[in-house]
A protein has these predicted regions:
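N-terminal polybasic/positive-inside topogenic patches
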Residues: 2, 9-18
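Short, low-complexity N-terminal intrinsically disordered segments enriched in polar/charged residues
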Residues: 20-48, 52, 56, 60
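A beta-strand edge to alpha-helix "cap/lid" segment located at domain peripheries
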Residues: 22-27, 97-184
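A structural signal for alpha-helical segments
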Residues: 34, 73-76, 137
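Short, charged/polar micro-motifs that form catalytic or ligand-binding hotspots
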Residues: 48, 71, 135, 139
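A solvent-exposed, acidic/Ser-Thr-rich amphipathic alpha-helical stretch
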Residues: 55-125
Length: 184
């Protein structure tokens, strides 16, 4: 009986340093999953920062030289992106609540790692208006973001994004991903 108890204790013991040193480094599959999750989080944080009027935090999402093409126009560089998003926020904040005049819901986000520090992806956008307006329908638009990402100084950033609106009116959305159609 005593031997069984001792064997049980040994089985629960923590590994020693020699055993830990034999543990292989992080598997590439796990690293890829962690990279994809960090990248997906960029788009979620973008929606949160924009909707809550935390425009200053967009430098945590975009590279300094990022290019953004959305319904309010094309912006190049993080300062232009902040200015453009600030103008869009003011335009939709008709009730002057200073937060959440719209809510960006992000869904179906896929990410493809194209290199050790580059990736591309797409996700759906369901954009709701929460500010008062004559039309009681809160749905503003449906669209798809096509993004390019790069790891800069150890942090993932969006380097290029294009919003394809598919409803209420299409703005050039096609079956070809915007990632591939950017030079067309």
């Amino acid at each position: 009986m005593r031997d069984a108890q001792n064997n049980h204790r040994v089985a629960l013991a923590l590994p020693d340093n020699e055993q830990l040193q034999k543990t292989p480094p992080m598997d590439n599959t796990i690293k890829g999953l962690l990279d994809r999750e960090e990248i997906r989080n960029l788009r979620t944080l973008y929606a949160h920062h924009l909707d809550s009027n935390n425009i200053a935090a967009l430098d945590q999402i975009f590279s300094t030289d990022a290019v953004v093409e959305v319904t309010v126009g094309k912006m190049e560089g993080v300062d232009a992106i902040r200015a453009g998003m600030d103008d869009a926020f003011k335009l939709f904040d008709r009730d002057r609540r200073s937060s959440y005049p719209f809510i960006h819901a992000i869904a179906n986000h896929w990410v493809k790692l194209t290199g050790p520090d580059t990736a591309e992806g797409r996700c759906y956008l369901i954009d709701f208006e929460t500010a008062s307006k004559p039309d009681p329908n809160p749905l503003l638009l449906l669209g798809l973001y096509a993004d390019e990402y790069r790891r800069i100084d150890g942090e993932w950033r969006i380097t290029r994004t294009r919003l394809e609106v598919v409803w209420p009116e299409r703005n050039g959305a096609s079956e070809q991903p915007a990632n591939e159609a950017k030079d067309a």
